[in-house]
């Protein structure tokens, strides 16, 4: 049996093997042409449209980022402007309130001075009237004293 296996192995090694891994015959150029044709067809049908779509996508993303950046910049500028306007409005409102308080205080002061002046005038008039009434009362009293003294004199002398 060993002899049979050895003879079989010798027959196998003596026969010529065709179609190996690196066989250089007419199929090699045909395979190269098929590979080139497949590459060209795939390039035309698949890779160029895919590349175009990817380029459009990149352009869209770049445009979107640019637009978003511009919108953000504009929003920041508007925010700053509105904050400045708000601060200015608050300052104006505080100035208006301060002026209104000063005006109110001036009005109150003038009203107090006017009331004080009126009160002083009233006091002066009242004092003058009281002095006039006092003088009249004293004159009446003097008249009555004269009348009474005359009556007392008449009664004392006439009796």
Swiss-Prot record:
One of its GO terms (molecular function) is proton-transporting ATPase activity, rotational mechanism. GO terms for cellular component: chloroplast thylakoid membrane; proton-transporting ATP synthase complex. It is found in: Plastid, Chloroplast thylakoid membrane. NCBIfam families: ATP_synt_b, PRK07353.1. HAMAP family: ATP_synth_b_bprime, ATP_synth_bprime. F(1)F(0) ATP synthase produces ATP from ADP in the presence of a proton or sodium gradient. F-type ATPases consist of two structural domains, F(1) containing the extramembraneous catalytic core and F(0) containing the membrane proton channel, linked together by a central stalk and a peripheral stalk. During catalysis, ATP synthesis in the catalytic domain of F(1) is coupled via a rotary mechanism of the central stalk subunits to proton translocation. This is ATP synthase subunit b', chloroplastic. It comes from Antithamnion sp. (Red alga). The gene is atpF2.
């Amino acid at each position: 049996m060993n002899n049979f296996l050895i003879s079989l192995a010798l027959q196998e090694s003596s026969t010529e093997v065709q179609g190996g891994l690196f066989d250089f015959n007419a199929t090699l150029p045909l395979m190269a042409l098929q590979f080139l044709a497949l590459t060209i067809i795939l390039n035309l049908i698949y890779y160029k449209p895919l590349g175009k779509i990817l380029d459009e996508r990149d352009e869209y993303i770049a445009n979107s980022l640019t637009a978003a950046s511009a919108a953000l910049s504009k929003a920041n500028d508007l925010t700053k402007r509105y904050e400045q306007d708000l601060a200015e409005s608050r300052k104006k409102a505080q100035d208006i309130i301060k002026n209104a308080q000063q005006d109110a205080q001036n009005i109150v002061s003038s009203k107090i001075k006017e009331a004080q002046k009126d009160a002083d005038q009233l006091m002066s008039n009242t004092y003058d009237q009281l002095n006039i009434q006092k003088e009249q009362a004293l004159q009446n009293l003097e008249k009555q004293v004269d009348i009474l003294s005359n009556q007392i004199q008449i009664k004392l002398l006439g009796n």
